[in-house]
Amino acid sequence: MTRMTKWSAALAAVVGGTAAIVGVTALSADAATTLTVAADGSGQYKTVQAAVNAVAANNTSRATINIKAGTYREIVSIPSNKPYITLNGTGSGPSNVVIVNNRSNAGGYGTFGSATVTVAAKEFIATNLTFSNDYGTGSQAVAINMNGDKGIYRNVRFLGNQDTLLANTQRQYITNSYVEGTVDFIFGDATAVFNATSIYEKRSTGGPLTAARTPSGNTYGFLIYKCTITGATNNTTQLGRPWGPAAQVLFRESSLSATIATSQPWIDMSGNVWQNARFFEYKNTGSGATTNSNRPQMSDSTAANYTPQKYLAGTDGWNPL
């Protein structure tokens, strides 16, 4: 896009009769940017995607999109050429800003394409809001598809049923958040740390929480760290199953309620045998945290290399904690 085309596009961004002048500022790839979204028209943009579109391609400074309280029924895509975007809910809590849609695999979008929000850009941040897919049951329906490296999600609710949260690739950090679903609702190939997060199995018949597909060459997959696991019914919820044969999942120092199927918390998936995956627990507590031959426990010496910092460090020493 030429400079003149960008300028024209910015001037054309009008909300409620007021020109979105900040859209002009956003055209500079080097300038820090703050944009405001409000469903009631009191901001510069009425939709989140319109604000994302206003951020300059190949921006080098953080662009913060403040989203006022409201429900935003839309599909949001953060493309790979728009790094350093923050979506910040300005309501009193994450339930006050909801980005929601109802695409599904059954609807012809495919599992990955069903996502309400797709993040392809690096160093994306989301705070104090909700990502939801309210399709219902009976098909995969993703709330968020995480792809960009070094994604951070703080005080975020992820709502859905089957396949709520797709940690698809790269490194993802989810902290002080809430995730709910029915089947495989934390899944993907990524290296992802869930820290101090509440995870809720909402189906009365239970189901597997995680379905990791960690590449065999990757040491780290999913770390569930100091989280709280609850569910609708007792003794029905599995910690996970291996979407890929080399799946790596560690539940560490977490509170496991009676919802966990204590005698068999790991199960097979699509020909992948759970015993061949890299499934472990370490120092969990709660009535669902018993030990037996079906619950491999990580040793202290090994656990020293399976901390949140180790999971996320990569080759650049990233530490968002």
Predicted regions and their residues:
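Secretory targeting and sorting signals
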Residues: 1-31
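Sequence-level preference for short, compositionally simple segments enriched
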Residues: 32-321
